Amino acid sequence: MEEYVYKDHRKLRLGYTTGTCAAAAAKAAAGMLLGGEAVEWVELVTPKGIPLKLPVEHINMSQESVTCAVKKDAGDDYDVTDGAYVYVTVSKIAQGFETDGGEGIGRVTKPGLDQPVGSAAINSTPRRMMVELMMEEADNYGYEGGLKAVVSVPEGVAMAKRTLNEKLGIMGGISILGTSGIVEPMSEAALVDTIRAELSMYHAQGQKDLIITPGNYGEGFLTDKQKLHLEHTVKCSNFIGETIDMACGFGMSSLLLIGHLGKLVKLGSGIMNTHSRQADGRMETLASCVLLAGGDADLSRRILNCNTTDDAVEVLWVTAFLQPAMEQLMRRIDSALKSRAGEDMDIEAVVFSNRYGVLGKTPGAEELIMLHRKWL
């Protein structure tokens, strides 16, 4: 596929989703079943409006069914399913057009996801695409009966171990995904969709008190230092503001945000997307907290010249300004979080560093920590 986007001064090649692969294979298999002749290529237009012509491989034809595969191409995106073959077997049925999952396709075991409990983890858009394309082939050949498409990915069980599927309650394989049909490298929308899916799952389970953490540092601190488990934890990456918004939309009661100073210090200046591409402001925020805590311009200047927040913490520690500066920072973080969340959801934060442990907590953080500890 030769379509590109430009991000961070890089030219990145687009790819296509497992959903597009399944839809293309379903169309090809239906056409071969009804027409009786093998095809080498299949054409379709993705929901994003991009036309594709994809090679059809691993064809197995019989009177009752046809199986074929389309190879997933994720472009320049890192994707565990890149290079996987998505197989579809199409067979005739009395009436209607059906889709299901076979080998390597997960099954939904928890409510709140795109598909109901018990269904194959094939999302709505790929299902719709498969049905529409099979109907199109039936019309082309004047076929008035029904067709059923079963999707399989032989390596799906192994691939699923490198995804969030098990945590989301999708067991036994991967999901067939895609809303636009196109994989966009470094897609923020895809990450936010994953966060939304986790929140939706917890909402459907009636779990209204969650821990959120930007990444692996936070998860490690939770388990090793705070003795909290990860069962009710959502990894929000850099999208703290959007996670808060979505949690409010799902009617969550509380969020406990736990993260490294290097990320959460930005909240002290109201920066709710903590990716360095969006904004920095780490040292400026800490320097202003030093001034608010009674420090002088020389100390603030030393903070501004630090390369990392760990370096800044070291300076504050040796000058006995760590605690007062962190108190000022936590006041600002508390204000920013509560302003974003509004009055309907409680939100608290814990900030830590790898060397010095907990650096600060918002006023109600300890209460939420105890709430989560009681579930251990």
Regions found by a protein language model. Give the residues of each.
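Surface-exposed flexible segments
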Residues: 83-87, 225-228, 362-368
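Short, amphipathic C-terminal "tail helix"
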Residues: 346-376
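Generic N-terminal targeting/processing segments that precede catalytic cores or assembly contacts
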Residues: 1-162, 166-168
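A structural signal for small-residue-enriched, beta-sheet-centric alpha/beta enzyme cores
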Residues: 3-6, 13, 168-174, 179-198, ...
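Generic domain-boundary/flexible-linker signal
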Residues: 110, 160, 221, 266-268, ...
